[in-house]
C-alpha cells in the first residue's frame, strides 16, 4: 500500500472488515478490467518496447536506458500516441500522472530491473502486452513506426547474438518452435512476421507495417539501434 503509483485499483470482494486502504490511496471497484488494461498496455508493454532495443544498444539496466533521453522519449511517444488512445482512464486515475510516474520509476536506480529479464520469453509476453495494441493500430491505420522498430529489434536480437557494442549474449526463449527457429534463421525479414507470437494478426498482409518494418530492419543492420532511434524520436 506504500506504492507510489498514482493508480491502485482493487477488486472490492471483501465481505468483512478490512484495513482503511483508501486512506493510502487505494480505489475499490467491482470491475478491475480497466485497471488491468492500463497496466498491460502502458507498464508491461513499455517494458517490452524498451527491452530488445535497449539491450542491443548495450544497456543492461532499465534505469540506465531510460536516463538516455532517446529511450525516454521513445517510451513516452509509445504511451501517448500508440497505446494511449486505447487506454481509457479507469476510475479517478490521472493517466498523465500515471505515465509520468512510470517513466520516473523506470529511471530509478533503487528499484531498477535487469533488461535481460525483460527480454526473457518474448514469445509469451508479446502476444499479451504488445500485439493487442499493434492489432488495433493496424486496424485504425495509425503510425506504426515505433512498433515496427520494436519488431525489427526483436528479430535482430533473436538472429544475431551480438549487441551493437560487439558483446555476445545468449537468447533465452524457451517456447520458440522449430518453425520459429527456421523463420529467424531465414534471410527474408518478412518471413519473420510469421513468428508464433505474432499469429493473432496477419502482419505480412499489413502493407504499411511491412514497409516500415523493412526500413527498420535495414536501419538496424546498417546503422545500429541508437542511430535509428535518434532519427525516430527527434521532434
Label every PLM stretch briefly.
Residues 31, 61-65, 94, 188, ...:
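Short, solvent-exposed coil/turn linker segments
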Amino acid at each position: 500500500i506504500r506504492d507510489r503509483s498514482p493508480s491502485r485499483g482493487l477488486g472490492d470482494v471483501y465481505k468483512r472488515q478490512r484495513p482503511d486502504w483508501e486512506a493510502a490511496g487505494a480505489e475499490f471497484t467491482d470491475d478491475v478490467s480497466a485497471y488491468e488494461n492500463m497496466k498491460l498496455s502502458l507498464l508491461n508493454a513499455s517494458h517490452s518496447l524498451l527491452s530488445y532495443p535497449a539491450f542491443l544498444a548495450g544497456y543492461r539496466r532499465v534505469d540506465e536506458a531510460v536516463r538516455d533521453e532517446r529511450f525516454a522519449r521513445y517510451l513516452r511517444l509509445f504511451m501517448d500516441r500508440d497505446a494511449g488512445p486505447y487506454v481509457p482512464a479507469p476510475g479517478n486515475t490521472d493517466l498523465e500522472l500515471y505515465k509520468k510516474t512510470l517513466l520516473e520509476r523506470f529511471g530509478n536506480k533503487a528499484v531498477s530491473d535487469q533488461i535481460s529479464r525483460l527480454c526473457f520469453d518474448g514469445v509469451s509476453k508479446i502476444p499479451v502486452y504488445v500485439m493487442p495494441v499493434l492489432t488495433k493500430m493496424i486496424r485504425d491505420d495509425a503510425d506504426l513506426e515505433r512498433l515496427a522498430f520494436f519488431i525489427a529489434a526483436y528479430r535482430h536480437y533473436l538472429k544475431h547474438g551480438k549487441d551493437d557494442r560487439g558483446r555476445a549474449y545468449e537468447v533465452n526463449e524457451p517456447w520458440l518452435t522449430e518453425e520459429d527457429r527456421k523463420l529467424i534463421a531465414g534471410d527474408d525479414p518478412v518471413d519473420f512476421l510469421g513468428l508464433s507470437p505474432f499469429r493473432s494478426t496477419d502482419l505480412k498482409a499489413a502493407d504499411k507495417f511491412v514497409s516500415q518494418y523493412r526500413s527498420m530492419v535495414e536501419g538496424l543492420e546498417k546503422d545500429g539501434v541508437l542511430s535509428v532511434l535518434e532519427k525516430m524520436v527527434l521532434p
